[in-house]
From Swiss-Prot:
Organism: Bos taurus
UniProt-listed InterPro entries: Cystatin_dom, Cystatin_sf, Prot_inh_cystat_CS, Prot_inh_stefin
Name by which UniProt lists this protein: Cystatin-A
Gene3D superfamilies attached to this UniProt entry: 3.10.450.10
Protein family: Belongs to the cystatin family.
Any one Pfam family match given in the protein's UniProt record, by short name: Cystatin
Keyword Acyltransferase: no
PANTHER family: CYSTATIN FAMILY MEMBER, CYSTATIN-A
SMART domains: CY
Broad class of the protein's primary localization: cytoplasm
Residues carrying N-acetylmethionine: M1
């Protein structure tokens, strides 16, 4: 991983799904929506003063959201923070930094 650069897109792992699940309540509060389906499809990561995860989430038939989650370094107090999101995405929309 190059510090500051985004990795190539990779299929979501169990760990990435767990990260997505942990910030789901933050996203639902910001979008004023409830997501019955919330499946991580793929992700990219970026090393900063911690790690940014860009995760493509499927929320229904051909409905996708891109989320950005910051995971702080182990010695810092907060662990996972939803720092951005993009709605109205499709399966083919590429994950990009935002």
């Amino acid at each position: 991983m190059i510090p500051g650069g985004l990795t190539e897109a990779k299929p979501a792992t169990i760990e990435i799904q767990e990260i997505a699940n942990m910030v789901k309540p933050q996203l639902e509060e910001k979008t004023n929506e409830t997501y019955e389906e919330f499946t991580a499809i793929e992700y990219k990561s970026q090393v900063v003063a911690g790690i940014n995860y860009y995760i493509k989430i499927q929320t229904g038939d051909n409905r996708y959201i891109h989320i950005k989650v910051f995971k702080s370094l182990p010695q810092q107090s907060h662990s996972l923070i939803l720092t951005g999101y993009q709605v109205d995405k499709t399966k083919d929309d590429e994950l990009a930094g935002f």
